[in-house]
């Protein structure tokens, strides 16, 4: 590759229509006071500067109004969750009735699977009871699927199929999934897929997965932890049955921030789902009459259990407003440019250091990935990770030898990629 030119990089940042958004986030700094080059937004996003003020609004309301804060104040807590319907719908490509904020990702995953995974408990070879997922999925998803299967008295060794992804980064990561869906046929109950793979950064072709699964009578659920805020999503148009996500990565809503879930409109009127229910999923009009029998709220709100986690949701509102204002199209365009530039830097580094026996795991096709690049090193991987850390580049380590880097378009700059290049020159 041609060495990145500092003047050209400065001009790119100067002309970047999203460049000003970086000033709306707190910049973490090293012990010497210098700011980090932060490439860990795939693990924890930065804090929007508006968060302390948003929290103060709610703590002031609590202090001054106490229980009356449910019905009074800037954002009455009774309907607090409704603040997120519009932004979340735009974020994931849904109708407002199809999304709701609350809980945490794995809690929502269990709630959704409790409703949508309805396996045939027969032990014959034609029983529809198999869950299909990608191999090497995030462990919480694996544990959740194992326990869902055991909850129905079935054996995960028989009923969970994990599809190995291709080693060749030029290959289509979705192809093995489609082949396995067709092979399982009528035995397949649910495809439960991480839309963007947390380890490799692969972005799967969700419309093709949905088409293949529905063709054999199966449902499709998605874990959007590494997709929401990272890649364009059109859950409603694609026909995805259900999905859930967290908000502390690309959505910048803070550690343990509130999750979200999506239920496609075609399932809203079904009364055969084994949904687990709580009082906040009851219709709002009669909720406080405390009726004995559950009357579901409209759409995804019926899947709520408890009232809004206001102190966690206040930062979420600030972060979503920034993302909503920037727009996914602009974010994706910048993301493609940033990641392509970082990819060239890493490939050049690996070419100059064959002794490391390194390679990029993330697909080479930009349409098959988000912003993250995962670089595996057979030798001295942790040495490189530590070296980058000492030189002000904050990345993410995953055993056995992978460094993940995620230039996030909402707050990273092209100069951050230049800094990586300059640091790698001296390794």
Tell me the role of every PLM-derived stretch.
Residues 1-427:
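Pyridoxal 5′-phosphate
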């Amino acid at each position: 590759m041609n060495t990145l030119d500092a003047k050209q990089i400065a001009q790119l940042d100067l002309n970047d229509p999203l460049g000003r958004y970086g000033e709306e986030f707190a910049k973490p700094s090293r012990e010497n006071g210098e700011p980090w080059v932060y490439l860990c937004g795939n693990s924890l996003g930065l804090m929007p500067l508006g968060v302390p003020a948003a929290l103060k609004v709610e703590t002031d309301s609590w202090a001054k109004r106490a229980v009356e804060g449910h019905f009074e104040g800037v954002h009455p807590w009774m309907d607090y969750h409704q603040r997120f319907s519009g932004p979340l719908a735009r974020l994931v490509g849904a109708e407002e009735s199809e999304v709701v904020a609350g809980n945490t990702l794995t809690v929502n995953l269990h709630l959704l699977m409790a409703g949508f995974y309805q396996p045939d408990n027969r032990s014959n070879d034609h029983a529809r009871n198999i869950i299909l997922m990608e191999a090497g999925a995030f462990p919480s998803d694996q544990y959740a699927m194992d326990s869902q299967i055991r909850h129905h008295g079935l054996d995960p060794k028989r009923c969970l199929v994990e599809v190995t992804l291709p080693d060749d980064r030029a290959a289509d990561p979705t192809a093995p999934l489609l082949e396995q869906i067709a092979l399982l046929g009528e035995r397949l109950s649910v495809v439960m897929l991480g839309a963007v793979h947390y380890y490799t950064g692969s972005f799967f072709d969700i419309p093709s997965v949905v088409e293949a699964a529905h063709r054999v009578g199966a449902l499709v659920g998605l874990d959007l932890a590494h997709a929401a805020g990272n890649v364009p999503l059109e859950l409603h148009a694609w026909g995805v049955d259900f999905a859930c996500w967290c908000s502390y990565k690309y959505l910048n809503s803070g550690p343990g921030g509130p999750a979200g879930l999506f239920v496609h409109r075609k399932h809203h009127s079904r009364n055969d789902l084994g949904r687990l229910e709580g009082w906040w999923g009851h219709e709002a009009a009669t909720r406080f009459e405390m009726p004995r029998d559950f009357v579901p709220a409209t759409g995804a709100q019926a899947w709520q259990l408890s009232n809004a986690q206001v102190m966690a949701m206040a930062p979420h509102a600030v972060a979503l407003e920034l993302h909503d204002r920037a727009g996914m199209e602009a974010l994706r365009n910048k993301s493609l440019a940033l990641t392509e530039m970082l990819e060239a830097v890493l490939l050049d580094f690996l070419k100059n250091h064959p002794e490391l026996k390194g390679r990029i795991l993330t697909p080479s096709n930009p349409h098959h990935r988000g912003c993250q690049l995962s670089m595996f090193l057979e030798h001295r991987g942790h040495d490189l990770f530590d070296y980058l850390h000492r030189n002000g580049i904050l990345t993410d380590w995953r055993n056995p030898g992978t460094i993940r880097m995620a230039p996030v378009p909402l707050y990273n700059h092209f100069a951050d990629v230049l800094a990586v290049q300059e640091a790698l020159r001296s390794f």
